[in-house]
């Protein structure tokens, strides 16, 4: 009986350990001087900055639409959405095409795509408070990779219209 109890304890410990060892890949992007991570499972494509068609009577952060392989996609400036200065378009500027369940595909403008990193549960700290404000409301966790902090974006907050 004692052996069975010990085995059950080990099983629970193993389950907790597996959860913390599960790894997720993130694309690290730069906005201004800050680094953010986007879960790679939500990324459909990364394309160079291109000409957009403006749409009238929409929030300022909705920069327009692009035609990508016959699909018309809205493009959001997450700099404006998050309260940064307007986008400065450079050779490093990219549009990341996100594939989201509710909204479908949507593009977000980022200053630079830096790298892909793999983070385990041990390297990610969830933000547990509900009353997030400012730029923090657009992140849901912080990851640590090679001694650097990466704010992990909450894509639902980025794409919600009410949070302009």
Regions found by a protein language model. Name each.
Residues 1-164:
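An acidic, low-aromatic, low-complexity terminal/linker signal
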